[in-house]
């Protein structure tokens, strides 16, 4: 296959694999040699073993390296316009930890609450704002004031529905943060109020019905 023809084909894909190329070229070993030649020429990039792209914009391929996966946290808040911060790193929730250039993959057991958006003609999996709030609380990777601002711009009923899917400790933290933002998750509180255990969280607030205590003291 001629280089020009090859590049025109893979430009339509966010990510392509050695297996895909070998199906086209008809020889797995030759495909590996062919792809290595393309890398040396600077025409394609290796993302991880067996995965390649021709694109420079990481958002195009960020959610196509691991499945399932979706963009969340800072980048999601920026997408929804709830923060003025411009994130340098794209944080992706998936089933394992890892990093590549300006992407960080964060392990999560809760890979739901996201949807498909279009970016430069490609599919990208983006967190719902409500799930981004939950991810921000449970990972403790976003300042509380930023999370509270997102809470003020979300669907509270949907946030409560999502929160009810979480474990008791996470429910307490989320309920606590939502109340700081001026709202109250009644169903969540009814679920957790009989649990007498305290949970540690990155807050300076003391004494609250959610049994959340600061881990800074």
Tell me what each language-model feature is.
Residues 1-71, 155:
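Short beta-edge/loop segments at beta->alpha junctions of small alpha/beta modules
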Residues 38, 45-48, 106-111, 150:
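Short, compositionally biased low-complexity segments
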Residues 81-148:
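Exposed, interaction-prone assembly regions rather than primary DNA-binding/catalytic cores
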Residues 63, 69-89:
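Accessory alpha/beta interaction modules
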Residues 39, 78, 179:
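Short polybasic/polar patches that bind polyanions
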Residues 54-57, 108-119, 153-158:
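Short amphipathic alpha-helical segments and their helix-coil junctions
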Residues 118-217:
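Hydrophobic alpha-helical interaction segments
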């Amino acid at each position: 296959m001629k280089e020009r023809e090859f590049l025109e084909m893979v430009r339509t894909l966010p990510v392509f694999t050695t297996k895909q190329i070998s199906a086209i070229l008809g020889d797995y070993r030759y495909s590996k040699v062919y792809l290595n030649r393309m890398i040396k020429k600077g025409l394609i990039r290796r993302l991880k073993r067996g995965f390649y792209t021709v694109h420079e914009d990481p958002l195009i391929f960020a959610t196509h390296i691991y499945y399932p996966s979706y963009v969340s946290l800072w980048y999601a808040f920026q997408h929804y316009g709830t923060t003025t911060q411009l994130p340098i790193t794209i944080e992706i929730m998936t089933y394992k930890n890892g990093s590549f250039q300006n992407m960080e993959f964060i392990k999560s057991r809760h890979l739901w609450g996201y949807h498909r958006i279009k970016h430069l003609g490609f599919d990208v999996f983006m967190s719902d704002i409500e799930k981004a709030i939950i991810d921000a609380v449970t990972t403790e990777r976003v300042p509380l004031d930023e999370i509270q601002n997102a809470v003020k711009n979300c669907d509270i009923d949907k946030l409560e529905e999502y929160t009810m899917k979480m474990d008791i400790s996470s429910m307490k933290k989320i309920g606590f943060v939502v109340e700081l933002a001026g709202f109250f998750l009644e169903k969540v509180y009814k679920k957790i109020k009989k649990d007498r255990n305290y949970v540690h969280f990155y807050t300076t607030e003391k004494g609250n019905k959610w049994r959340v205590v600061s881990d800074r003291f």
